[in-house]
C-alpha cells in the first residue's frame, strides 16, 4: 500500500529572497539557436527534478547552499547558454540570448529531517511546492530564467536539491550532464570531465525539408467525445516493480516475445491498464508514446557532451477495444515495433516536420507517454555529500497536459530489492480502477488467459 508517513508529513520551509546566479567569469554575448528537435510545442514547459542527500560527517561544517551556489557559478562558465534567456523569432523559432543574467536560485531551511520523509523516497513528495518554489514571473518559456534551483537544508544536516528546467534546452541526459558537472565543480574540479557541446544545427531541418517517415505522434486528433483527461480531482500515486512483480507480469508474455525488455513489458501493461481505467469509447484510438534517446542512432553518433534534446516520441496506435480485449502480447508487439522505428532518418524527418507543420505539439488525446530514466544517472550526482538517496523526476503527469506522462525511475525498496518505481497521475475515479486491475494481474492465481487484467501494486 502507499506510504502514509511521507504523504501526511507537514513541515515549514523558510526561504531567503530568490536571487540570480551568474557565471563566475565573463561569457560570450551571442545568440544561439535551438535545434528543430528542441523547438517543438510539446517541450515548451518546465520539468521538475528533486534530489535528497544525507548528512556526511566528512564534510564537516561545510554549507551545501554555499558549496552548490559557488559550483553553479563556475559551471555556468562552461554552460553559459543556461544563464541566458529564450527569445522567439520568425516561424516561432527559439533562440538563446546569451545575456549572462544567470539562473534563479533559492536558499531555504526546513524544520524536518530526511528520516521523516519515510524509508522509501518516491513521488509524489509532500510539500513539493515548498521544496521547489515557483518564484513569481519565473516560469515562462520566453524571457525567463532557464533553470530554477532550490537548495533546502534539513534539520538533520542533510539537504534537498530541487531543480526546474525549461525542457526546450535539454533532455534528461543533457540535464544530468549539467548536474554532474555542478557536482564535480562542488568537489573541487577546475572543469567538468565532459565538456558541453552545443552543435544544435546537427538536429535542424534539412533544406528543403522533407518528411520521409510516418509520424502519428503528431496527428491532429479531435477530442470528439470529451476523453481528454479531466484536470480536476487528479490523484498521484507511485507503483513499484521489483523482481517478483516483473516475474508475475512475464507469465502473461507469449513465448515468441519472452525476450522483451522490462521497459517494453511495463509499457504494454501500464498502457493497457490505464486505458481500461479511463474507459474511452471502444472504437476510439488510443496511443502510447515511448521516449527514445536517439544519440546512438546517428552515424556517427551525436558528439559526447551534446546536451540538447535528442529523443523522439514514436507512437503505438490501436483502438481501446483491441487494446483491452486482446491478450497482453498484442500491446507488447505494438510497443516493440514502435521503439525500433527511431533511426537517424526518423529524427531528420521529425525536424523537417517541425518546420513544415509549425512546430506542433505531440498528440495528447487518449495518449500515454512514458520516459525511462532508470539509466539516466540522476541518483549518481554527488555534490560532495555522496550519492542521492533519491534522484529523479519530482512527480509524474508533468507537461502541458497533466496526467499524460509517466517516468520509470530506479528504486530500492525497504526490503533492499532493486526495481523501478513509476509515478502515475489519473483522475480519482480512474485511479481506483487502475489499482484494481494492477492487483488482479499480480495475484499468484491470476488467470493467464484473462485479457481484462493489467497489473501492479502501489509502492510500499
Curated annotation (Swiss-Prot):
GO terms, molecular function: acyltransferase activity, transferring groups other than amino-acyl groups
EC number, UniProt record: 2.3.1.196
EC top class named in words: transferase
Inducers of expression: Up-regulated in the leaf during the hypersensitive reaction provoked by a pathogen infection.
Membership in a protein family: Belongs to the plant acyltransferase family.
Active site: 167 (proton acceptor), 382 (proton acceptor)
Signal peptide: none
A matching Pfam family: Transferase
Record's function text: Probably involved in the formation of volatile ester benzylbenzoate.
UniProt source species: Nicotiana tabacum
PANTHER family in alphabetical order: ACYL TRANSFERASE 4, OS05G0315700 PROTEIN
Gene3D superfamilies given in the database record: Chloramphenicol acetyltransferase-like domain (3.30.559.10)
Keyword entries, A-Z: Acyltransferase, Transferase
Reactions catalysed: benzyl alcohol + benzoyl-CoA = benzyl benzoate + CoA
Protein name per Swiss-Prot or TrEMBL: Benzyl alcohol O-benzoyltransferase
